[in-house]
Amino acid sequence: MSHEHVNFPVYGQVDYFKQQQPQQPQYNPHLGGKQKTLDPIVTGTSVIAIKYDKGVVMGSDMLLSYGSLARFNSTERMKKFGGYTIVGASGEYSDFQSITNTLNDLVTDDHCMDDGSKLSSEEIWNYLARVLYNQRNRGNPLWNTLVVMGYQGGKSFLGKVDLVGTCYKDDIITTGYGSHIALPLLRKARDENPNMNLEQAKQLIQDCLRVLFYRDARSSKKIQISVAGEEGIEISGPIELDTFHWNSGEAAVKNFSQV
């Protein structure tokens, strides 16, 4: 009876680690670079907005975080489009830059039509919902949650679109960590004062952003507030929130040091 020689793996002679490694992707210069990301890298946190009696107010901080590093602290996350609309964004900032370019092209094309009408806030909101849903179906979503607000023809508009194209309209909109912290505060204030004026709405937004600064590790106390109302649309300059005065504990520290 003949015995066939069988080669069994011998410890130390087989590189199991090398065999388990995935095949490395080969660079193809004809494919070009990837333009959009599947992983958020430089991100912004919450955007919050509420309707008041004659318009809409929206607020956000100006911090962009590189992972957990507070990297860029003076960046606008709200942009004007046309004469009636402001869009605020949380999430990946490079994707928001791509969306900004797309909307600027849309507004330019609409202006070139010269038909006497301008894009409304609701039309821009619907367009963004289709764009984000299309990118999601391609498996390459734009990693943003967008808040669209505007005022036209005596009517206020406030809507939201997320990274998979889900969209809805409401009187109060929040994104990010603000959906957990700021949303209950905004709802309570609106229930107590359903016809708040502009100054009350601005103060409410500032108070909510102050709470988010205390509770959200990705936020800052440098903020911007946008208004869409009878006098048009406006984005404020940087506002520094007055926060808790930590020197109030100096007396306790001095007493403790004497013990």
Curated annotation (Swiss-Prot):
Gene3D superfamilies: Glutamine Phosphoribosylpyrophosphate, subunit 1, domain 1. It holds the Pfam family Proteasome. It is found in: Cytoplasm; Nucleus. InterPro entries: Ntn_hydrolases_N (IPR029055), Proteasome_beta4 (IPR016295), Proteasome_bsu_CS (IPR016050), Proteasome_sua/b (IPR001353), Proteasome_suB-type (IPR023333). GO terms for biological process: proteasomal protein catabolic process; proteasome-mediated ubiquitin-dependent protein catabolic process. One of its GO terms (cellular component) is cytoplasm. SUPFAM superfamilies: N-terminal nucleophile aminohydrolases (Ntn hydrolases). The keyword NADP does not apply. Non-catalytic component of the proteasome, a multicatalytic proteinase complex which is characterized by its ability to cleave peptides with Arg, Phe, Tyr, Leu, and Glu adjacent to the leaving group at neutral or slightly basic pH. The proteasome has an ATP-dependent proteolytic activity. This is Proteasome subunit beta type-4. The gene is psmB4-1.
